[in-house]
Amino acid sequence: MRLGRIAHPEGICFAIIDGPKDAPMQELVAKEIAGTPFTPPEPTGREWKLNEVRLLAPTLPTKVVALGRNYADHVAEVFKKSADSLPPTIFIKPSTAVIGPDAAIKIPDYATNVEFEGELAVVISKPSKNIKAENWQDHVLGYTICNDVSSRDLQFKDGQWARAKGIDTFCPLGPWIETDLDSLNLDDQKINAYLTHEGSREQKQDSNTDQMIVKMGG
């Protein structure tokens, strides 16, 4: 199931994004659900074509907990070191960084070297703490896409990552949450990013979750 959050002509709601997996966006339908995706979804009967609404961030996290330096190829590209010599590190993006998939990223004047990072994002289904590795999927609602926007100049200048990665709008999420946990091989998912402008489309990132140092559930 695909669960999203939309702005429609009468307000904002969560919705089931319905349609074939390979259908173009304009053929998908957003079916409003009562409440939030964190309870069994109950359709209200209202629906809109997806091109009649605006996709928002599919969830409203209190914070985004991230694992940096977790892709071997990315560590080599950005930090010029091997994954063995530079272990992963945890950092947090604030809720104010979260925006929808089509919202504008606003770069402040003091950030002069801003880069994208396409990421696999895990949406936690309930308050959780001290989870055993073998039970991790019991706490997952689904997966979405994150653009971990980063100001490299601030990141290396500050020595810590809060400012460089936590600027307002520096965490686009979406377009929706995919809840079909069994159909995804999380150890072999392509992570691609494209830059589009006036009809042109240029691939800017070509990675895969098989480059993860700490695997899902690890």
Segments (PLM) and residue ranges:
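N-terminal non-catalytic cap/leader segment that marks the start of a structured domain
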Residues: 1-89, 184, 192
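A generic local secondary-structure boundary/capping motif
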Residues: 4, 54-56, 78-81, 105-114, ...
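Catalytic-pocket segment enriched in acidic/His residues
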Residues: 10, 32, 45-46, 74, ...
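Short loop segments at secondary-structure junctions
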Residues: 20, 96, 125-129, 149-150, ...
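Structural signature of FAD isoalloxazine-binding scaffolds in flavoprotein oxidoreductases
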Residues: 83-101, 116
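Non-heme Fe(II) oxygenase catalytic core, chiefly the N-lobe of the double-stranded beta-helix
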Residues: 102-136, 141, 145-154
